[in-house]
C-alpha cells in the first residue's frame, strides 16, 4: 500500500520528477502538469494557458498498515491545498467526500472531512469531524491559515511552507 505520506515524500520511488517525462503527476510535482499545459501547442486558440480543475481528490484517514491516520490525512490536505492555491492555472480543487461513505470505509478508504455511522447500511450519516475539517474551514483565511496548518509541518518534515510550495501565497506571513 502506498502511504499517504508518499504524496510529498516519494522522491525515493523515482516515479515523481519535475519534467514532462514524469511517470506520475501528484501534488508534489503539480507544477509539472501546468507547465506542460503552458506549451504553445497546448494553449487555447487565443493563446492562453488552459486551466485545470482537480475533482474527486482526497486522502484517506485510515491505513491498512497504520490504522487511523487523521493527522496525516489533514497534513496531506494542507500540503495539497497550498500547492493548488499557489498555482495560477488550477481553477478549482474539489474533494471527493464531505462525509465518509460506509461502502468505501469497508474497503479501507475514509476520504471524508467527517466520519460516518457504520450501522446504517450504505446510508451516509456524519458522526464526527476529523482534523481535516478544521483545516478545510480555516486554511484559506489569512488570519488562520498558518495556524491551521502548523501541525502538518513536522509530519511532512519541513520548516516553512515556502520551502516546498512554489509561489507560496502566504510567504509574507511566515516567520
Regions found by a protein language model. Give the residues of each.
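Short, small-residue-biased leader/transition segments that mark boundaries at the very start
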Residues: 2-4
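Cell-envelope and extracellular/periplasmic
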Residues: 6-7, 57-58, 62, 98
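A solvent-exposed, charged loop/short amphipathic helix patch at secondary-structure junctions
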Residues: 8-23
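Aromatic-rich peripheral "rim/lid" segments of glycoside hydrolase catalytic domains that contact
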Residues: 62-175
Amino acid at each position: 500500500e502506498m502511504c499517504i505520506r508518499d504524496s510529498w515524500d516519494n522522491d525515493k520511488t523515482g516515479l515523481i520528477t519535475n519534467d514532462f517525462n514524469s511517470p506520475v503527476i501528484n501534488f508534489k510535482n503539480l507544477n509539472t502538469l501546468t507547465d506542460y499545459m503552458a506549451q504553445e501547442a497546448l494553449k487555447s486558440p487565443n493563446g492562453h494557458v488552459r486551466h485545470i480543475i482537480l475533482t474527486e481528490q482526497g486522502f484517506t484517514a485510515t491505513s491498512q498498515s497504520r490504522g487511523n491516520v487523521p493527522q496525516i490525512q489533514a497534513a496531506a490536505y494542507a500540503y495539497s491545498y497550498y500547492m493548488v492555491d499557489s498555482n495560477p492555472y488550477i481553477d478549482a480543487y474539489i474533494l471527493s467526500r464531505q462525509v465518509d461513505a460506509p461502502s468505501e470505509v469497508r474497503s479501507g478508504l475514509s476520504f471524508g472531512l467527517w466520519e460516518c455511522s457504520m450501522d446504517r447500511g450504505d446510508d451516509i450519516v456524519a458522526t464526527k469531524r476529523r482534523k481535516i475539517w478544521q483545516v478545510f474551514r480555516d486554511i484559506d483565511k489569512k488570519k488562520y491559515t498558518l495556524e491551521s496548518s502548523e501541525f502538518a509541518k513536522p509530519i511532512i518534515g519541513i520548516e516553512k511552507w515556502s520551502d516546498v510550495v512554489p509561489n507560496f501565497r502566504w510567504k509574507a506571513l511566515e516567520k
